[in-house]
Amino acid sequence: MILGIGLFFNACEKPKETLETTQEQATLENLNILMNNGEKLIINQRNTQDKNHNFKNIEPKKANVLQDLLVTSDKKNIKLLFFFTTWCEPCVAILSHLENLQKQFGDEIGIYGIAIDDLVGETENFQESVEVFIQENQYFLPLAYGKNREELFSALGGIDGIPLIVLYDEKGEYIIHYLGAIPEEMMEFDLSQSVAKMRTK
């Protein structure tokens, strides 16, 4: 139990100036995020006054920004965005949980990794670091570490910690997100509910 509580709040943090973008935040419109397996996410951003946000262990302001995104692809499934860096131990620790969830739910969910080392100041040998990360951790899920990530990072106003996991439904609507190495059971519960709703539509 104590270990579980520790993992819930365990997240990699960097100084505020490296995690937060200093660029002017522009509204995203049809931003294409290309994955290393050829899959593509299309991200749009909208302004909303809706205050009924659903977030866990993260400040409301960030939840508002994430809820304003519409994340779609050519697949009608639940999408899980996994923001991470290659040096973050909690990020590595959560990989096995993500792989378990992908196997459990199959094509009804899509898990997309988004590496941000270079966006938080770790620019040296970024491509090589990602390739080593893939090999050492036998990472097989779709992964983005190319162009256009910076625009998404800027629209988010930076990221407060990692791993950051965000769920969107089959229509691209925000569901929920988590900060830190959270228990697999929590993600499984939320995914089960979302998949069940998707099946009834």
Residue ranges and their predicted role:
Residues N77-I78, A93-I116, Q135, E184:
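Conserved helix-turn-beta segment immediately C-terminal to the redox Cys motif
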Residues I109-N125, Y139-R149:
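Thiol-based oxidoreductase modules, predominantly thioredoxin-like and allied folds used
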Residues M1-P60, T200:
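N-terminal targeting signals for export/organelle localization
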Residues F83-N100, G121-E122:
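Conserved redox-active cysteine motifs that mediate thiol-disulfide chemistry
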Residues N77-K79, F84-W87, D118-L119, G161:
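Short pre-active-site segment immediately N-terminal to redox-active cysteine/selenocysteine motifs
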Residues G161, L167-K201:
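Thiol-/selenol-based redox modules, centered on thioredoxin-like
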